[in-house]
């Protein structure tokens, strides 16, 4: 979708950062994410660099990764990204927690929702319309279940390239002060079969 140079650069950096952080937790054998983990490993390995400049960049990327690590003692079950918890049987000392910035999550979800509205509905999200990116949820959570049901019954799913599925639907909520029904555009984004982002827009 059309965007100004500043926004394109800003959201591009956010997307790149989140993609890098999320890559580290995907299943390297899953069809939706095949090759992703291997690509990240290569991007961190200076020995794979062809030039000195590239070698320095890979070292900076490794240093950046090290700064993302959160002490294991600070991690609680309720702040682990859904479906990114430890693999059963993994020794505790082998776990490396990586932080996902909440603001980055929201900004990336907003970018996906705005872009999807433009592509699927041929419309812009105006400045007075709120894009509500929901906190990470497990698929069995009540709110996630309701959104999936609404998309299944009143929407469609679109496969946008390998490992990326967009669910797009409509629901109505009642405004208590007026009793009128307000339409909501619903989105469910699934990336690599692992990252799931839910968003809604009040129309």
Positions of predicted regions on the chain:
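Short microdomains enriched in Cys/His and/or Lys/Arg
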Residues: 1-6, 24-38
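Short Cys/His-centered divalent metal-binding micro-motifs
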Residues: 2-21
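Alpha-helix initiation and N-capping motif
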Residues: 15-17, 33, 37, 144
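Generic hydrophobic, helix-prone segments enriched in Leu/Val/Ile
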Residues: 18, 26, 39-44, 112-113, ...
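Amphipathic alpha-helical surface "interface" segments used
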Residues: 25-26, 41-46, 133-142
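Intrinsic-disorder-associated interaction segments
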Residues: 29, 33, 51, 55-58, ...
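Short flanking/linker segments adjacent to small metal-binding domains or redox-active Cys/His motifs
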Residues: 40-86
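C-terminal, charged low-complexity interaction regions
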Residues: 74-203
């Amino acid at each position: 979708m059309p965007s100004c140079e500043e926004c394109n650069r800003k959201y591009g950096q956010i997307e790149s950062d989140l993609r890098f952080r999320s890559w580290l937790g995907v299943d390297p054998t899953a069809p939706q994410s095949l090759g992703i983990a291997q690509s990240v490993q290569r991007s961190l390995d200076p020995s794979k660099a062809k030039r000195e400049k590239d070698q320095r960049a890979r070292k900076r990327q490794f240093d950046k990764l090290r700064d993302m690590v959160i002490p294991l003692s600070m991690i609680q079950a309720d702040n682990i990204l859904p479906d990114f918890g430890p693999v059963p049987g993994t020794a505790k000392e082998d776990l490396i927690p990586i932080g996902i910035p909440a603001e980055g999550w929201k900004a990336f979800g907003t970018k996906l929702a705005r872009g999807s509205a433009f592509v699927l509905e041929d419309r812009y999200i105006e400045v007075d319309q709120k894009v509500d990116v929901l906190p990470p949820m497990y698929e069995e959570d009540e709110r996630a279940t309701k959104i999936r049901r609404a998309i299944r019954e009143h929407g469609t799913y679109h496969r946008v390239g390998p490992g990326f599925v967009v669910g797009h639907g409509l629901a109505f909520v009642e405004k208590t002060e007026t009793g009128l029904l307000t339409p909501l555009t619903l989105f469910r984004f699934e990336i690599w079969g692992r990252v799931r982002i839910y968003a809604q827009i009040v129309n």
